[in-house]
Structures are given as C-alpha cells and as structure tokens.
Amino acid sequence: MDGMKYIISLFFIFVFLEGSKTEQVKHSDTYCVFQDKKYRVGEKWHPYLEPYGLVYCVNCICSENGNVLCSRVRCPSLHCLSPVHIPHLCCPRCPDSLPPVNNKVTSKSCEYNGTTYQHGELFIAEGLFQNRQPNQCSQCSCSEGNVYCGLKTCPKLTCAFPVSVPDSCCRVCRGDAELSWEHADGDIFRQPANREARHSYLRSPYDPPPNRQAGGLPRFPGSRSHRGAVIDSQQASGTIVQIVINNKHKHGQVCVSNGKTYSHGESWHPNLRAFGIVECVLCTCNVTKQECKKIHCPNRYPCKYPQKIDGKCCKVCPEEPPSQNFDSKGSFCGEETMPVYESVFMEDGETTRKVALETERPPQVEVHVWTIQKGILQHFHIEKISKRMFGELHHFKLVTRTTLNQWKLFTEGEAQLSQMCSSQVCRTELEDLVQVLYLGRPEKDHC
C-alpha cells in the first residue's frame, strides 16, 4: 500500500497548490472549479491524478462557499482472511460482501484514431511525436473526454529479451529481482529488474517509487499551463513531456526540438550546444514541421542611441516616454492610459510604419501597419497579437501613453488617411496623426 499512500500524498500536495491558486479567481456562489472542471454545490467526485488515473481513496465535495473539500477514505477493519481488491473502489472487501458485477462507473469516453477509450484508460499512441528518439514512446490516457499524452524516455535495458508491461509504453527486463508496487486501481506495475534501468526509471517524477522517495511532483491535468505543450525542465532519462490533445482538434500537431515539445503555432529560439540560445533565429512549429527564420534588425532606429540588451537579438531604443502629466497609477486626468509603441523601418524606398496599443482588457496588443512607397499607401492592415508574441518583437519603441478616447480619434483619422493616401502622395500626414496620441499638459495643471 506504500504506492497508494504516495499517490494520495501527492494529490493532497496538489490540492493545497490548486486551492491557493483558485481561491481568488475561481470562487463562485453556485459552483466550484477544480482541475478546470465545474462542480455543483454538494456534488461529490473522485479526483483524477495524471498519469495514475482516478484516485478512489480520496473523496472531494463542492461546499456551499465555493471551496473544494477533499478527504481521504478511511477503510474499515476486515475480519476475513482473504480480502479482495476491486477496481473503482478504494477499500478491499470480503468475498461475501462484493458488489454486483454490473455496478459500473460511467464517465465520458475518448475517441482517438478510430478507437474508443474509457475514462481512466491508458494506451499507447503511434506516430504522435514525429521526431521522437528511438528510446522514446508516447503514452496516453483518457480523462473526461480529453486525451493526455506524454513523450516518455525509456530506461536503458541490459537484458536480451525485454517484455511489455501493463499501462506502460516502455518495455522492461524480466528477472527474479523484479519489484512491484500497487497502481491506483490495484493493478501491479513491474519495475525493471536490472540496477541501471531501475535507477534511471526512478528519476521520472511521473512514476511512483516502491517506497516513499520521489523524484518530484507530477504534472496534473488541472495545471494552469495545460494548453498546448507543457515542458518538463528535467532532460534526464525517464522524464515525460506532457501535452493535451482535445478531441475536437487534429492529433499530433506538435514539434520536438532539442528534447522539448512545442505545440502548433508556438515559437522559440533554438538552443545549440556550441553557441547556446541563438537569439537572432526564431523557430515556429507548423503542424509537425519546424520553420526557422533569421531575425533582421533595422538599419535605422527612431532614437539616436539604441542599446544592446542581453537576451535580445536587435538593439532597442531606451523605453523613456515623453514627460506627461500622469499620476502614480498611470492615469491622465482620472482616465486610464495605455502604452503606445511605434516602429519605423525603411528599405529600398519603402517605409513600414507600425503603431501599437497595449491593452489589459483584453490582454493583447493591437498593431496598425502602414506600408508606404514614394508617398503612396501600398498596404494597410490591423493585427491583434498576444503580449508574449509582442515581446519577441524587438524593433518597437515605447513613445507615449494615451487614453481610449484619444485612440478612437486616432483610428477615425487613420480610416480617412487610408483612403486619401492610397490615391495621392502623403508625406507627413501619418506622422502628424500620431501626435494625436500624445497627451498635453492641462492648462494651469487642472483637468
């Protein structure tokens, strides 16, 4: 039962961390939110702990104040010689008190590659990670209609004829010295017999050891970062990189680079052994292919003395906006202000001017892009990107802060200029329009 005690201990650590995160933002008078799932007041359930499955020895309930209360199941003392462990039940039973065979727990199943899997069922997926190493395999589990898959690095084996084991995509050695521990549902999970494989296997924070020592905390389906790829910081043998696959989306849209897994659309700087992180190259995961491009720095900067900053490819202008009449909260005459950035790039007679507004609700950056050639507007468009993606763009300079009303005036004037400058030469009209975003000092320091 040491393995089960270990799993329960991990769960209560997770409950503490989960509760501290959700107390302020996940509170509601009518429901509780736990592991990104809503529960009604009074509703009870067994929590799901990846990759062990449902923890039947823990009961959770949604209290009236919106808090999740979880408690360990206390098993009664049995007075029979051979108690029986039953799947989907925590406590063993005496043979004469077994429940009916058709008493099944129903949960939402998963559909993957034409096969239906039940909630809590583990299986092996082929072809999910296109660039996996020969000693790696992908193991998946079904949880409430979602498929959770992990890229697992298998331990090095020293035997000639390894065997397959239940609920694991890695093969292990068969031997007299095999140890075992109880799985969450009472199944027996075999540990590699040879010393080297066993030592490597125990370094995985996802696999329960036979006694009490653990390599670290596992990742849970309810973790806040589980949208896209979740990357384990350890790169040792036996680690798992966990991703979430939603049944409504295509499977296998991930890329693996330098031992790390990235979801479709995610960007990163490559890490080369000889050079470290290459800041001037940006790679993007396109379905399962990596597309890497060199970052081109501008020849001219809107400031006189751009600075080189560690971790950035291109030089950047110092972020010192003009002195304006803002209070300590960044407001102007009681109205909330938002940062405005500008970028000007000139090449071969073509000027690309970008004006960006950073907002908090929603948390994004709205970028207005003007492409002008010989004074004639060639192209104009607006794009909205995340703050994280905007942070990867190093050619923007913080120029001022503005209010929502001033930004509306800017966009209205911009719409007029986009029509006028497409048919006649515009030299300074756009530069003049940007001045609308600058907030002047109120007369006599009164609003």
From Swiss-Prot:
PTM comment, free text: May be glycosylated.
The region annotated as signal peptide is 1-22
The free-text tissue note of the record is: Expressed in heart, brain, lung, liver, kidney and testis.
GO cellular component terms, alphabetically, are: extracellular region; plasma membrane; synapse
Secreted as UniProt keyword: yes
What PROSITE patterns does the database record attribute to this sequence? VWFC_1, VWFC_2
Q: Which SUPFAM superfamilies match?
A: FnI-like domain (SSF57603)
MF-aspect GO terms: BMP binding; transforming growth factor beta binding
Position of sequence motif Cell attachment site: 174-176
Which keywords annotate this record? Answer: Developmental protein, Differentiation, Glycoprotein, Neurogenesis, Osteogenesis, Repeat, Secreted, Signal
Please state the protein's primary subcellular location: secreted
Q: Where is this region: Disordered?
A: 200-224
* Gene Ontology BP terms: AMPA glutamate receptor clustering; BMP signaling pathway; cell differentiation; embryonic axis specification; excitatory chemical synaptic transmission; eye development; negative regulation of BMP signaling pathway; ossification
VWFC domain sequence ranges = 30-95, 108-174, 253-318
Which residues bear sugar attachments?
N113, N286
Location of this chain's protein in the cell = Secreted
Q: Gene3D superfamilies per the record?
A: 6.20.200.20, Complement Module, domain 1
The protein in question is named Chordin-like protein 1
The species this protein was found in? Mus musculus (Mouse)
